[in-house]
Structures are given as C-alpha cells and as structure tokens.
UniProtKB/Swiss-Prot annotation:
Domain of life: Eukaryota
Subunit and interaction comment: Homodimer.
Function text: Conjugation of reduced glutathione to a wide number of exogenous and endogenous hydrophobic electrophiles.
Species whose genome carries this gene: Homo sapiens (Human)
Family named by the database record: Belongs to the GST superfamily. Mu family.
Reaction catalyzed: RX + glutathione = an S-substituted glutathione + a halide anion + H(+)
Binding site for substrate: Y116
Protein name, as recorded: Glutathione S-transferase Mu 5
Boundaries of every GST N-terminal domain copy: 2-88
Length: 218
C-alpha cells in the first residue's frame, strides 16, 4: 500500500519531502489540493477534507502510511529518514542534523515572510544585503564535508538543498562566492534517483509559494 502525501499543488514545504521519497525509492502517491484564484483564494478543496482524515493536528503537508498519520513537514521528513537510517549515526552527526534542521527552517520562513509581505519591494534590499552573511554560515558549517552531517547523506541535506535552491532562484548569483555550497548543490543533483526525478514530469521546481504571495517563481 503506497503512502499518501497531501499538499497544495506547489513546491512549498513539500519539496524536500518529495525529494526524500524519491531518493529512498518509497512507494507513494500525491494528493494535490488547488488554491483558488484571487481575490478569495478559495481553500475549499482542502477544507472539505481537513477534518475527515483522522489527523491529530490537521494541516498540510500530511503523510499517511497505513495507521501512521503525520503532519508537520519536518516530522514527515524524520519519519521517512528513520526508515532508511538517514538521521545521522554518531552523536556528533545527530547534533549537526538537529542544529541544521532548525536553522534551515528559520531561514526558509524568513524568505516566506518576505515573499508574502505586501511591502516586498521595500523589504527586499535589506534581505539581499544580509543574505551573503547568512550563506557564509552555511558554507562554514559544511566546510570540506561532502554532506552537512559528515560523510553520509542525511535528511537535512534535503532541507538544505531546498533552501539553498530557493535562494538561488530568488537571487541567481547568491551562491557564486561559496564554492563548497555550489559543489554541494551539484553533488545533490547528481544523485541517481534525484537526477532522474528532476528530469521527470512529476518534478516541480518553480511555484515556490501559493497564489497569494507577493513574489513567486514560475
């Protein structure tokens, strides 16, 4: 019985989950919900099902795997990762995983808040001014390691790839000064399962956000 991943028909918080499902060769189907157009942005496709799925905290994304019903994007990632030993092995690796998991979400939400803000054009210059210093921290944290936790890939590499890719979509030259981050991106995209998925019709790189965002990618 395949797992069911439920989310809006955008990239959003499901991107890293989709990538991890593909990398682990997991059997899954997607339930994609469509947001209505402006000005109402009708959410009835989701709201009609929201409280009928048996979710403890009904929200998107969700993952249903038999009796296991999970919400919160990072809880979903961790659930999949535990099945495949992708949470780090040593204590040092697990600490690095925990740190980066939360750091990535902080940086992800900064960009989300900016892109949904009606004052986007006013706020964008300050965001871009501060971006190099934030990327420098990622570069220093990665160092000469192939993956963020160490020698072996973990689920936070999927989160890190997602947020770094979002930033280079937003500002295409932002990674130019950080060779190890560019190498990380290339290494990740070169993974056999990831490369195949990115070439498929199922892959969704654009539409970072919902229709109500002030700025979005195509």
């Amino acid at each position: 019985m395949p797992m069911t991943l439920g989310y809006w028909d955008i990239r959003g918080l499901a991107h890293a989950i989709r990538l991890l499902l593909e990398y682990t060769d997991s059997s899954y189907v997607e339930k994609k919900y469509t947001l209505g157009d402006a000005p109402d942005y009708d959410r009835s496709q989701w709201l009609n099902e929201k409280f009928k799925l048996g979710l403890d905290f009904p929200n998107l994304p969700y993952l249903i795997d038999g009796a296991h019903k999970i919400t919160q994007s990072n809880a979903i990632l961790r659930y999949i990762a535990r099945k495949h030993n992708l949470c780090g092995e040593t204590e040092e690796e697990k600490i690095r995983v925990d740190i980066l998991e939360n750091q990535v979400m902080d940086n992800h939400m900064e960009l989300v808040r900016l892109c949904y803000d009606p004052d986007f054009e006013k706020l964008k210059p300050k965001y871009l001014e501060e971006l190099p210093e934030k990327l420098k921290l990622y570069s220093e944290f990665l160092g000469k390691r192939p993956w963020f936790a160490g020698d072996k890939i973990t689920f936070v590499d999927f989160l890190a790839y997602d947020v770094l890719d979002m930033k280079r979509i937003f500002e295409p030259k932002c990674l130019d000064a950080f060779l190890n981050l560019k190498d990380f991106i290339s290494r990740f995209e070169g993974l056999k399962k990831i490369s195949a998925y990115m070439k498929s019709s199922q892959f969704l790189r654009g539409l970072l956000f919902g229709k109500s965002a002030t700025w979005n990618s195509k």
